[in-house]
Every structure is written in structure tokens, then in C-alpha cells.
């Protein structure tokens, strides 16, 4: 089912012969860029590919694991590289018009007869097989991607289906977790994101709305009603600034929000000409954002004005000015006024950096890697692509 030919691994593209939509970076592997990719075949055996990307060497397949039924999402556990969750449709009655974007919507509610499940799996030490450890039971409707603690602990996970949010107990490979809290009771839940900077804070998207939650107390903490004009496909918290959240969806807009002032977004980017399926902050340089769309492209954005780099550089500048102003006057010889040269630095501009066009089908998923500037994208036709932030940006950002 897979193109396992590794004789030419200098390419940044790896082709799978089945349709795909599930992609997860293995975050527990800090020193290598490894990803799990799952297929969504309706009537054939499905598989998960373990792929590795090395700069200068391209992409290669390390192993292939059989997996039951069509895979809709994968979440690698940040506390153990051998563990991952998958969400899969056991009925096999999903959409089968692969070339029609409208029929590839994994968040619509017209699939009531489908039986979605989510299980925790373990990759064995020799990386040649996987074992199902347990199933997260009790969901109704379509299960969304499982959310793990972004701090890397195994203290809890969060799952979402079409209407409810569930907080689960500690995850390990010995004991099945239990549901600690269930809340939400919403319509058309599509995606969630855990804030890595504020304890117990979760954001969810349902239809065109965004809500914030204290998930330990099951209480709503903020709300953006009609955040988008059409369905929201992805949300993601800034990993370095506590109150900033991005959202993207079917209105082709990428929006940035301050969760303390939710009336209007603080920034809007336009550039895609069809639905945005995935949008992610860079964990190390949060001014970098990647988006993927059913216009078959991936876009890289620069959001300097709302980044932690902007705050840091302004603080340093203000500190230097204050130190200079506090020096005794006798140590400051009078100098004639000098014209200030304003050097334009494109790193400091909020703008589209680059559009990547290696895909020929809807790009459902994207993910940053363990490396600061390498990212992966996955399209429905089975094409897995790795790319880098342009050198002119990465060279500058490396010194921040």
C-alpha cells in the first residue's frame, strides 16, 4: 500500500498509495523529526507509517503498522514516543467521493450511523508492530483528535465528540483511564486546544463559535460568538504568550485573538482561496504560523507584532534607553542631532512569507517538527511533504 522504496531519500516528498488525513509529530522524540501518518481506505486494510525526516537527506519510512478501519486522526503521546492515540471509523460507511472537497468533511453531522472509536496503541521496541492497549469508551458521534497535556505529562487527556468534552484520568500502559468530568453539551464541536501557559485552560470550536473552559471545574471562561462567518476547522494557543489564540476555517481567514478582549480579533490574515483545515504556531518562534487548505497549498506567515520576540526586543530596547538616561550628565558629551536611519526589516513585518505548492489535493494536516524550522504537510491523495522556513528568516531567528 505504501511506496517503501528508500533508494532515493533525498526528496522532501513521500507518497502513500491510499488516501490520508491523519498526521502527528512524535513530540517525545526531541532529537529527531519523526511523524505518524494514517490512511483512510474504506474497503482495504489501513496502515500507519512511521516516517523520519532529516535535513539534507529527505524523508524515509522506518516502519509500517497494520491498523483496523479508516483512520481520522492520530495523537502521539508527548510523555512516551511509543504511545499514540488513533481515532477511527469502524463502520466503513464514511464518505467515499475522494475528489470532492465537500464530501471530505470529517466534522459534519451527517454520519450518525458511523461508529467512531479511539484507542491507545503501543509501538513495540523493534518498531515492527503495534498493540492496542485500551479504548476510550462512551463517545457518541464523531470523535475529534485526542488532546494531551502540552507540558508533556501523562496526568490527563481530553477527548471531544460532536457535543461533549471529557476529561480523563492519568494515562499509562497498565491501567485504563476513567472519565473525571464530562461537560459542554454543545452543537457541532469540531476541535480543541489546551493552553500550555495557563493551568487547566481549554479552548473549543463549535460551528462558528469559540469557547474557553476551566476544564477542572467545567466552567466557561471566555467566548467568541460568530468568530468566523463559516465553520471553524482549527484553533491553536500561542505556546509562548498566555492569552493569544489562532483560529481558521471555511471562510479562508486566519484570525488571532486575545482571550481577555474577545469582541474582535487582533489580527486577520487572508490569502487562501478555499477552506483552511489546519493552522499551527511554531513552538520555538511563535511569530511563525503555518496553514493548510483545500486550495492545495500550505502557507507560512510571519506575525511579529503579536509575538514573544516583539515583547522581548522591546523590553531590551526600553532597558537600554533607561540605562542611558540615568547616566550622569557629565558623562554624556553633547553631540549634534544625527538623522535616524530606519532600516526596513521584513522579519518585523506581519505578512505572508511563502506559499508552498507541492500538493495536488486538499492539504488536511500540517505539523511542526522537533527542529525549529522544519514542518510537514499531508494531503488527501497520500502525499507527505516536508519543508523548511526560508533561510533568510531562519538565519535571523536563530540568533533571537
From Swiss-Prot:
Cysteine pairs bridged by disulfides in the record: none
Pfam families named among the record's database cross-references: Beta-prop_EIPR1, WD40
Per UniProt, which keywords does this protein have?
Repeat, WD repeat
- CC terms in the record's Gene Ontology section: phagocytic vesicle
Entry's Gene Ontology BP terms: protein ubiquitination
Q: Which PROSITE patterns match?
A: WD_REPEATS_1, WD_REPEATS_2, WD_REPEATS_REGION
Residues covered by region (Disordered) = 95-114, 314-348
Q: Where are the WD repeats?
A: 138-178, 227-267, 271-311, 358-397
Instruction: Show the InterPro entries listed in the entry.
Output: EIPR1 (IPR040323), Quinoprotein_ADH-like_sf (IPR011047), WD40/YVTN_repeat-like_dom_sf (IPR015943), WD40_repeat_CS (IPR019775), WD40_rpt (IPR001680)
Tell me if Hydrolase is a UniProt keyword of this record.
Answer: no
Transit peptide among keywords: no
Composition bias (Low complexity) maps to 96-114, 314-333
Q: Which SMART domains match?
A: WD40
Protein family (similarity comment):
Belongs to the WD repeat EIPR1 family.
| PANTHER family, alphabetized | EARP AND GARP COMPLEX-INTERACTING PROTEIN 1, WD-REPEAT PROTEIN
Protein name, entry field = EARP-interacting protein homolog
- The species is Dictyostelium discoideum
User: Lineage in the entry?
Assistant: Eukaryota, Amoebozoa, Evosea, Eumycetozoa, Dictyostelia
Amino acid at each position: 500500500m505504501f511506496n517503501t522504496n528508500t533508494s532515493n531519500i533525498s526528496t522532501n516528498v513521500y507518497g502513500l498509495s491510499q488516501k490520508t488525513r491523519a498526521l502527528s509529530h512524535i513530540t517525545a522524540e526531541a532529537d529527531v523529526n519523526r511523524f505518524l501518518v494514517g490512511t483512510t481506505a474504506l474497503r482495504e486494510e489501513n496502515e500507519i507509517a512511521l516516517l523520519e525526516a532529516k535535513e539534507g537527506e529527505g524523508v524515509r519510512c522506518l516502519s509500517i503498522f497494520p491498523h483496523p478501519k479508516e483512520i481520522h486522526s492520530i495523537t502521539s503521546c508527548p510523555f512516551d514516543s511509543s504511545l499514540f492515540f488513533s481515532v477511527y471509523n469502524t463502520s466503513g460507511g464514511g464518505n467515499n467521493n475522494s475528489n470532492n472537497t465537500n464530501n471530505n468533511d470529517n466534522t459534519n453531522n451527517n454520519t450518525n450511523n458511523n461508529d467512531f472509536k479511539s484507542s491507545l496503541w503501543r509501538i513495540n521496541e523493534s518498531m515492527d508492530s503495534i498493540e492496542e492497549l485500551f479504548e476510550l469508551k462512551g463517545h457518541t458521534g464523531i470523535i475529534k483528535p485526542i488532546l494531551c497535556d502540552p507540558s508533556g505529562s501523562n496526568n490527563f487527556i481530553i477527548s471531544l465528540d460532536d457535543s461533549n468534552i471529557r476529561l480523563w484520568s492519568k494515562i499509562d500502559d497498565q491501567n485504563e483511564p476513567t472519565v473525571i468530568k464530562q461537560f459542554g453539551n454543545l452543537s457541532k464541536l469540531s476541535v480543541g486546544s489546551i493552553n500550555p501557559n495557563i493551568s487547566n485552560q481549554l479552548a473549543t470550536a463549535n460551528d462558528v463559535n469559540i469557547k474557553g473552559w476551566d476544564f477542572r471545574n467545567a466552567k466557561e471562561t471566555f467566548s467568541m460568538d460568530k468568530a468566523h462567518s463559516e465553520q471553524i476547522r482549527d484553533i491553536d494557543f500561542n505556546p509562548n504568550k498566555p492569552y493569544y489564540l489562532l483560529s481558521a476555517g471555511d471562510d479562508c481567514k486566519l484570525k488571532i485573538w486575545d482571550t481577555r478582549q474577545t469582541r474582535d480579533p487582533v489580527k486577520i490574515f487572508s490569502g487562501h482561496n478555499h477552506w483552511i483545515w489546519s493552522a499551527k504556531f511554531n513552538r520555538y518562534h511563535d511569530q511563525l504560523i503555518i496553514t493548510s487548505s483545500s486550495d492545495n497549498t500550505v502557507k507560512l506567515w510571519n506575525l511579529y507584532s503579536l509575538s514573544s520576540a516583539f515583547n522581548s526586543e522591546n523590553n531590551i530596547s526600553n532597558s537600554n534607553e533607561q540605562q542611558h538616561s540615568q547616566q550622569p550628565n557629565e558623562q554624556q558629551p553633547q553631540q549634534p542631532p544625527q538623522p535616524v536611519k530606519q532600516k526596513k526589516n521584513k522579519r518585523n513585518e506581519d505578512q505572508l512569507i511563502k506559499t508552498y505548492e507541492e500538493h495536488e489535493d486538499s492539504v488536511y494536516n500540517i505539523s511542526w517538527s522537533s527542529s525549529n524550522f522544519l514542518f510537514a504537510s499531508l494531503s488527501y491523495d497520500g502525499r507527505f511533504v516536508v519543508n523548511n522556513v526560508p533561510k533568510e528568516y531562519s538565519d535571523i531567528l536563530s540568533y533571537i
